């Protein structure tokens, strides 16, 4: 028997199960093909060394191509309950829904080739749409960040001296000069020193004193790493001293130089990977209960600071005495799930003048842990004027006066959307086991209301709605959440973007104490410079309004200086040269 997943209908659960099984079949075929090759096989060498391709490609060449998908789902039955006239109506065979058993070496059958072309077409359209979307996102990012530069005091500021970051990337390291984000690899320095070091092992006190002397300029995280690594090493006092000196030298060399256009570098470092991201909304691997926006659409959603994400979700962790029990987790989940009257009835009846009858479904009431009394209470507190008569499994509502059909139907719809229990906006809940504890995952987000529910760990609720975090926990929490969301969105796509870039974008978006988007309604549209605003979008109205208000152009940023042909005050343009001319006589 099929195990039903919470939050999915029987059809959706079956579909999820079939897709999972077909995916396993493809992997199995690929693995058996992979195992049949020896180490000298050219394709195997390419995949193993990481030169090109992966075991998936080998599986498709020698095993089976697997399921072809369109918009993250199997090929739909668009032609009178079948994908093509070659299949029977409502045929459950995987072949009829785009599963390709052949591989590239043997070649595809006619029908398989057709389904494969359908999947391939989506890839081409996806690429065409993606380039323009990511291109526009990069343009917005560059416009918002271009005027940021590093000052001589190590801060990142805009042309008017407003501080965006007190220390670039929280450690002042230039990503281009670093070793995968680190100024130096302490393990490597210790290793190279230990080869020639021959003195007596330094004591713990000696190492601590030496490190304290050198690491005042390091950031706390780096100081801790250096100290821990040196304490574990077997170096002498002289060796420790040499390592500290070398580390300090490398750290100084890896710092960002004053005047550097950190803003433009950041915009390009986030914009460029955008072209490599996927556009579609996929399901979580394994968990098919909730849709989550991933890839480029999610990245655009974050930098645009959309008030509501397309797919808001929450991960709710439970208190100590609840998290190990599945029954208690289900009980809490039922309290969270938004339950309307429409979810509890089997049918409604009306005479279209004064009476509306609600026939309640006992199974649905049991599933949502509700009673008829709960429904009556919800109706009484809804402030609608009608008489309520519960009898058996039904509730009859009588309006105070006769009304026309439209009024009665409108009233019925309002009654059906009345909340009985739960948190508004949370439309679906799923409980998932993570290690030994149970976690509640939701579709829909509402932190403020979830906090009021008993049994949840109030310090451990996660949501992907940044605006909600800013409204409930403040701008600092929103800034940290924005960094985490941007990082995980890029990492999920297998893209390596340094966290310093993500931090700068997040800090700029939150620098005014509230969330600002990158585009014309946010940072780009609130720039002080008239020419910079006009050069981006809505040119004529911007100039007309500025003229009306009598604004003055100070020519302190990048765009405005390019327009008038003056020196850009970034990089070498930051410095003014003065020369004393000594006149004879």
What are these regions (language model features)?
Residues 91-95, 119-122, 310-313:
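Gly-rich Lys/Arg/Thr-decorated short loops/hinges at beta-loop-alpha junctions or inter-strand turns
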Residues 10-17, 43-46, 50, 129, ...:
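Non-transmembrane, amphipathic alpha-helical segments
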Residues 1-42, 48, 54, 58-112, ...:
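Extended, well-ordered alpha-helical scaffold/bundle regions in very large, multi-domain proteins
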Residues 22, 134-135:
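General helical secondary-structure elements
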Residues 110, 114, 123-131, 137-138, ...:
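Intrinsically disordered, low-complexity regulatory segments
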